[in-house]
Curated annotation (Swiss-Prot):
PROSITE patterns (alphabetical): QOR_ZETA_CRYSTAL
EC code(s) of this entry: 1.6.5.5
Top-level lineage group: Eukaryota
Residue numbers binding NADP(+): 53, 158-161, 181, 200, 229, 246-249, 269-271
Function of the molecule: Does not have alcohol dehydrogenase activity. Binds NADP and acts through a one-electron transfer process. Orthoquinones, such as 1,2-naphthoquinone or 9,10-phenanthrenequinone, are the best substrates (in vitro). May act in the detoxification of xenobiotics. Interacts with (AU)-rich elements (ARE) in the 3'-UTR of target mRNA species and enhances their stability. NADPH binding interferes with mRNA binding.
An example Gene Ontology CC term for this record: cytosol
InterPro entries, per the entry: ADH-like_C (IPR013149), ADH-like_N (IPR013154), GroES-like_sf (IPR011032), NAD(P)-bd_dom_sf (IPR036291), PKS_ER (IPR020843), Quin_OxRdtase/zeta-crystal_CS (IPR002364), Zinc-ADH_QOR/CCCR (IPR051603)
Modified residues (N-acetylalanine): A2
Protein's recorded name: Quinone oxidoreductase
Length: 329
């Protein structure tokens, strides 16, 4: 560490494992932006399920140890690299990825993963945009290629990605069905664009969905927990229906004939494999949503930086999501 280099507090992970492997350190060097990089003073950072998969070592992405978790930050630009022209010190911004990790007082990001945060949205809302909204937009507009008038079912609709999917689907003229596991979660789903909501903890909730949509079935299913729901999803689809897998925590056995008889398809999405061109298209759609007003993140539990391990426990084991989980700095 260079003499006189400024320090910050940050969560550090020295080995893959449970939430307890995350340690708060106060002697981490503040990164210095190079070329096309932006240094952001972090005001809030989103906590995503993918953060827990990466931390546990079960995700395809395995950062070099030690590392700082966190991809979605919102804050103020502190400094920029010499080749950055789109941002300047003092700008309010949010990110869809970071280079140095977002569970920290400062975060470094490539300038093409940084976006201006409108004044109408606060920093907590800004930290809830990145992965949830870009993922939902990718799933609905690029992978499912939804059309106005289609029926979409969003599993886990009360979480960050789920709420984003509800808002986007409603804005694009779809009939929106959602599932959630608590009364509070169901109310949030209805408040954010769903026409109907179903309690996935009820034994007969699949039958209720079938009754609601009738013989036609569902055109698109946005699936957050494929290892639990995928087999049922295939039976709910219309002819030519699509299941878009956003999340899964393990394997599941399905009958391929369920796809053959309806000409249906299963497609997985992973935001980190998207091209720069796709990110630009997603960003344009979401910026329009901010301007018009349908993009309005819902904030769930809020934790201080030192409670990051508790946040990771809660995002996996909570009874039901109620908005986006945030670390507030």
């Amino acid at each position: 560490m260079a003499t006189g280099q400024k320090l910050m507090s940050a969560i550090r992970v020295f080995k893959f494992g449970g939430p307890e492997v995350m340690k708060l350190q106060s002697d981490v060097a503040i990164p210095i932006p190079k070329d096309n990089q932006v240094l952001i003073k972090v005001h809030a950072c989103g906590v995503n399920p993918v953060d827990t998969y990466i931390r546990s070592g079960t995700h395809n992405m395995k950062p070099l140890l030690p590392y700082t978790p966190g991809l979605d930050v919102a804050g103020i630009v502190e400094a920029v690299g010499e080749h950055v022209s789109s941002f300047k010190k003092g700008d309010r911004v949010f990110t869809v990825s970071t280079l140095s990790g977002g569970y920290a007082e400062y975060a470094l990001a490539a300038d093409d993963t940084v976006y201006m945060l409108p004044e109408k949205l606060d920093f907590k809302q800004g930290a809830a945009i990145g992965i949830p909204y870009f993922t939902a937009c990718l799933a609905l507009l690029h992978s499912a290629c939804v059309k106005a008038g289609e029926i979409v079912l969003i599993h886990g609709a009360s979480g960050g990605v789920g709420i984003a999917a509800c808002q986007i689907a409603r804005a694009y003229g779809l009939k929106v069905l959602g599932t959630a596991g608590t009364e509070e979660g169901q109310n949030i789903v209805l408040q954010n664009g769903a026409h109907e909501v179903f309690n996935h903890r009820e034994v007969n909730y699949i039958d209720k969905i079938k009754k609601s949509v009738g013989e036609k079935g569902i055109d698109v299913i946005i699936e957050m927990l494929a290892n639990v729901n995928l087999s049922n999803d295939l039976n709910l689809l219309s002819h030519g229906g699509r299941v878009i897998i956003v999340g899964s925590r393990g394997p599941i056995e399905i009958n391929p004939r369920d796809t053959m008889t309806k000409g249906s398809s299963i497609k997985g999405v992973a935001l980190y494999s998207s091209t720069k061109e796709e990110f630009q298209q997603l960003a344009a759609a979401l910026q329009a949503g901010m301007e018009v007003g349908w993009l309005r993140p819902v904030i769930g539990p809020v934790y201080p930086l030192e409670k990051a391990a508790q946040a990771h426990e809660d995002i996996i084991h909570s009874r039901g999501a109620t908005g986006k989980m945030i670390l507030l700095l």
